[in-house]
Amino acid sequence: MSNTDPQPPQKLPLNWVVWTLAVALMLYYLPAMRDRPEPAIKLPYSEFRMLLREGQISSVTLRGSELDGKFITPRMFPEQRRQYSRFLTQLPDFGNEAILAELEEQNIPLEVKEGHDASSSKVILLSYLPWIMFMIILFWLSRRTFRNFSGRGGAFDFDKRLETQFECQKPDTTFDEVAGQTNAKREVQELVEYLRDPDRFHRVGALAPRGVLLMGPPGTGKTLLARALAGEAGVNFYPMSASEFIEVFVGVGASRVRQLFKIAKENSPSIIFIDELDSVGRTRGAGYGGGHDEREQTLNQILAEMDGFAGHDAVIVLAATNRPDVLDPALMRPGRFDRHVTLDLPDQEGRVAILKVHARHIPLADDVNLNQVAAGTPGFSGADLKNLINEAAIQAARENRDHVHSLDFDIARDKIIMGAERTLIIPPDEKHRLAVHESGHTLVAYYLPNTDPLYKVSIVPHGRSLGGTHQLPLQERHTYPEEYLRDKLAVMLAGRIAERELLGSVSTGADDDIHQATGLARAMVSRWGMSKEVGPVDLRDSEEHPFLGREMAQPHHHSEFSAEIIDKAVRELLVAAETTAADLISTHREKLDRLVALLERSETLHKAQIDECLQTGAS
């Protein structure tokens, strides 16, 4: 005798019942739909008798008191604007014997079928069955949808969803992988010591910063530094993008914040990392949502949680942003994100270190000098340099080489700076105008004393542009003198001046040049005080990259009269830059002609070729 308990009979799942009924209903109705009779017109009894006497009826089917017949030939009925081959007629309760006799006399086939009244209950059931099935399926889908939302990680089951979403990580990243950011690593080093041994700090009453804000341009390694901090300290790491807090339902963001901080405290020492903090940390009360929208509720909950840390909670909140200027002031006060760590674009020494980190597993040829690569990539972030290494490796693989050569790095750098080369057939006259335009930029950049050295000029389409003149600074610039900016304006406008001088007209090719030059000139006047008429006054209209709420709430700091003065000063700067470019082009007209011819023939000129052409006149 078995000791196992008898198993209760399993219930047939509801979805199987629904699908079985649906299939059965479909099998029942498909033949009926396939054999659906053609449409029929209802005829009065008198008209039926007339057509019967005229011999226009071919066959008749009798169903109770209803007569279903067919015409010998289709008949046109103007009221319905169509022909009918079939008709229906309701017979009276008397005189049917005469009709039957007349049908028999004319040898018209007569078929008698069961009337509707005999099976009225069946007809009613079948007519309502599709609606019953529709309601059952709708009910099943509703239950299944709600179950998916509420029981399987849906929008109604926040707690279960968050427990899996905030999964603890143990990064193995170290500070050695964060190259080119020596100062930033030095600033967060004491946080590592605190997380490793918080009791040592508590004994003397010291508290570690509750919040550390990592600031810097995109691609400088803010997320990498946060992971390295957790890896060096050996603590739990809870990464979260700020945009993930926001949900379609009000209150979800605040709930997620509470859950995240609760889990981090229970598993301390730990680090909470919030990426792109400006998604929820922007200044409150500046947009359409007033003071009670979902984003602001989330921000308020973050502030409340950071205030609620106890002295023994070994939890540090790291956040990253590239827009610290738009953050709410309440986030920046002591006790919250009171320590700010800036990650700048790496200098040449830092770029060398970054290249060495990313090239560890790349087979480099003997002609590759990472110091030269770093010298030729000023302004590149860590992410840009990583991409440079990868693009060079892809280029080597494309050429079926086993090692990455210096030429691969040059091609990869050009692709990043200028965009990917694309095939485009340009008409000869347009190609000539393009060569004139780019040669104008090149000539003026070559002769002006305060511009960056030329790197390359090309009329081969790259990215979204048809051509380009590219310059690379010899070293990083942190400030820009006025003479440098004035010469930069002249270089920007030199292309259209060359078109006007050599071709007698200008084209739309200078659209972006004018846009960039106008923006630079306006900044010189309204932000940097480089106009005698305006003076050293900050009269900028808005942030460089404003978001909607901040822009709407920001007043203009000048009158219409001041705006006219600014516009006049901007125009004077641009006209002066055009004059400078025109003078140089007029003075070196012969060299410009030679440069145009050489560029049109070669399509791409490097610095050495440009120098040779403009210095010796070689063509």
Curated annotation (Swiss-Prot):
One Gene Ontology cellular component term attached to this UniProt record is: plasma membrane
Enumerate the residues binding ATP.
Answer: 216-223
Tell me a GO biological process for this protein. protein catabolic process
- Chain ranges sitting on the Cytoplasmic side read 1-11, 142-619
Which residues does Zn(2+) bind? 437, 441, 513
Tell me its EC number(s), please: 3.4.24.-
Give the signal peptide range.
Answer: none
- Please indicate the ranges of residues that lie on the Periplasmic side: 33-120
Query: What Gene3D superfamilies does the record tag this protein with?
Result: 1.10.8.60, 3.30.720.210, P-loop containing nucleotide triphosphate hydrolases, Peptidase M41
| Gene Ontology terms, MF aspect | ATP binding; ATP hydrolysis activity; ATP-dependent peptidase activity; metalloendopeptidase activity; zinc ion binding
Which membrane topology describes this protein? Multi-pass membrane protein
| Main localization of the protein described in the UniProt heading | membrane
Transmembrane domains' residue ranges? 12-32, 121-141
- Subunit composition? Homohexamer.
Q: What is the annotated role of this protein in its UniProt record?
A: Acts as a processive, ATP-dependent zinc metallopeptidase for both cytoplasmic and membrane proteins. Plays a role in the quality control of integral membrane proteins.
Q: What is this protein called?
A: ATP-dependent zinc metalloprotease FtsH
Name the species this protein comes from. Hahella chejuensis (strain KCTC 2396)
**Lineage of origin:** Bacteria, Pseudomonadati, Pseudomonadota, Gammaproteobacteria, Oceanospirillales
The gene behind this protein is ftsH
